[in-house]
C-alpha cells in the first residue's frame, strides 16, 4: 500500500511528455510556444465560464419567474433600449478580448528564426522519417542523416512506450533555438510534438518551416497528424532534449559512425 501511494504521488508530480490513456488536458509545456497555448486556453476558458454562468442565470430566472403558475397573464414587452444595447455591445466585446491575445500568439508562432543555432530537416516517408542535420558535415561533405523507424509492437524494451518509441531519436540541445524544415518524400505527412506545441504539415512539393526551443531536458513523443496511408498510426516521433555537451558528443559519435 505504501509503495502504491508513493507511486501515485510520483506519477502526480511527474511531467507528462507523452499521450496517456483517457487524457483530457494538454501535455506539460516544454517550449514557450506550448506554454503560450496553454495560457491562452485558460484565459479563453475564463470567458467561457462567465458566458455560461450569465446565460444559465438568465435562463433559470426566466423559467422561474415567467411561467403559467406565477404569471398567468404574460407581459407584453416589445421594446427595451437599455437591454438591447447591453446584449449588442457585451457579445461584441468578448470576442475582442479573445482575439487580441489569440492573434498575438498566432503571429509569434508563425515567426521563423532568421539565424537559428541548428537546422534540422524532417522528411516524411511511408512509413518512417528521415532526418538531416545540415549544420554538421562529415569528411565526404555529406550532412548528418539517419532514418527513424518505429519499434515493432512485439519488440519493445523495458521502459519503452508501446507504439511510440523509435530506433533513432531526434536529439536536440535544450534551451537552444532550432529551425525545423518539414517536407515529404511521397504523400502528405505531418511532424507534430504536442509538448512542444508544434504541428507542421509536410506537403508534397513544399518545404515548410517552423521554430522550436525546448526549455528542459527530457524525451518528448509525437505522431503523424495527417492521414498518410495504411501505417499512419505507426509513425511516431521522438525528440530527446539533452545538454549541450551531450549533444556535441552525440553529433561526434554519429559523424564517426556515418564515415565508417
Curated annotation (Swiss-Prot):
Transmembrane segments: 36-56, 89-109
Reaction catalyzed: 4 Fe(II)-[cytochrome c] + O2 + 8 H(+)(in) = 4 Fe(III)-[cytochrome c] + 2 H2O + 4 H(+)(out)
Role, per record: Component of the cytochrome c oxidase, the last enzyme in the mitochondrial electron transport chain which drives oxidative phosphorylation. The respiratory chain contains 3 multisubunit complexes succinate dehydrogenase (complex II, CII), ubiquinol-cytochrome c oxidoreductase (cytochrome b-c1 complex, complex III, CIII) and cytochrome c oxidase (complex IV, CIV), that cooperate to transfer electrons derived from NADH and succinate to molecular oxygen, creating an electrochemical gradient over the inner membrane that drives transmembrane transport and the ATP synthase.
Membrane topology (UniProt): Multi-pass membrane protein
Sites where the protein binds Cu cation A1: 189, 224, 228
InterPro entries for the chain: CcO_II, CcO_II-like_C, CcO_II_C, Cupredoxin, Cyt_c_oxidase_su2, Cyt_c_oxidase_su2_TM_dom, Cyt_c_oxidase_su2_TM_sf
Co-factor binding details: Binds a dinuclear copper A center per subunit.
One of the record's GO cellular component terms: mitochondrion
Keyword entries, A-Z: Copper, Electron transport, Magnesium, Membrane, Metal-binding, Mitochondrion, Mitochondrion inner membrane, Respiratory chain, Translocase, Transmembrane, Transmembrane helix, Transport
Protein name (record): Cytochrome c oxidase subunit 2
Mitochondrial matrix side: 57-88
Binding locations of Mg(2+): 226
One Gene Ontology molecular-function label: cytochrome-c oxidase activity
Co-factor requirement: Cu cation
EC number annotated for this UniProt entry: 7.1.1.9
Mitochondrial intermembrane side: 1-35, 110-260
Chief location of this protein within or outside the cell: mitochondrion
One GO term (biological process): ATP synthesis coupled electron transport
Quaternary structure and interacting proteins, as annotated: Component of the cytochrome c oxidase (complex IV, CIV), a multisubunit enzyme composed of a catalytic core of 3 subunits and several supernumerary subunits. The complex exists as a monomer or a dimer and forms supercomplexes (SCs) in the inner mitochondrial membrane with ubiquinol-cytochrome c oxidoreductase (cytochrome b-c1 complex, complex III, CIII).
Recorded family membership: Belongs to the cytochrome c oxidase subunit 2 family.
Species assigned in the record: Oryza sativa subsp. japonica (Rice)
Gene name as annotated: COX2
Cited PROSITE patterns: COX2_CUA (PS50857), COX2_TM (PS50999)
Binding site residues for Cu cation A2: 224, 226, 228, 232
Disulfide bridge positions per record: none
Subcellular location: Mitochondrion inner membrane
